Swiss-Prot record:
Natural source organism: Anaeromyxobacter sp. (strain Fw109-5)
A GO MF label: tRNA binding
Keywords: Ribonucleoprotein, Ribosomal protein, RNA-binding, rRNA-binding, tRNA-binding
Similarity comment: family membership: Belongs to the universal ribosomal protein uL16 family.
Annotated protein name in UniProt: Large ribosomal subunit protein uL16
Top-level taxon of origin: Bacteria
InterPro entries: Ribosomal_uL16 (IPR047873), Ribosomal_uL16_bact-type (IPR000114), Ribosomal_uL16_CS (IPR020798), Ribosomal_uL16_dom (IPR016180), Ribosomal_uL16_sf (IPR036920)
Pfam families for this protein: Ribosomal_L16
Oligomer and partners: Part of the 50S ribosomal subunit.
Length: 138
């Protein structure tokens, strides 16, 4: 599972997701990319599930880059606990995603394989996505 090795502070405020992503919205390494079209939180498990779906489909055919990292800790209180007595313990980590953010990049495969692989991965993610190609959208 992806998570930070160490953090300056253990717990973080909830925050807001406004606007669109300007950084991380272009393809860096790959020929194809999976781009978010809405905002949301991607958990480390969801990122990993989508990665497995892509790599299983393309097998050894292509190279995959993960462009998001879950660095925001999400806390949770135990069940049947009274309110108060501070913030809960860290349960898992999420990556904050805004519209336009490229989540995954893929190279070394043809159009059809990239389309199918990203379609399988999109089903594992809680945000709406679209497929982008270097130079144009598919």
């Amino acid at each position: 599972m992806l998570q930070p090795a160490r953090t300056k502070y253990r717990k973080m405020m909830k925050g807001r997701m406004r606007g669109k992503a300007y950084r991380g919205s272009d393809l860096n390494q790959g020929e194809y990319g999976l781009q978010a079209t809405e905002c949301g939180w991607l958990t480390a498990r969801q990122i990993e599930a989508a990665r497995v779906a892509i790599t299983r489909y393309v097998k050894r055919g292509g190279k995959l880059w993960i462009r998001v990292f879950p660095d925001k800790p999400i806390t949770k209180k135990p069940a049947e606990t009274r309110m108060g007595t501070g913030k809960g313990n860290v349960e898992y980590y999420v990556a904050v995603v805004k519209p336009g953010r490229v989540l995954y990049e893929l190279a070394g495969v043809d159009d059809e394989s990239a389309k199918k692989a990203f379609h399988l991965a999109a089903h594992k993610l809680p945000v709406a996505t679209k497929l982008v190609k270097r130079g144009s959208t598919l």
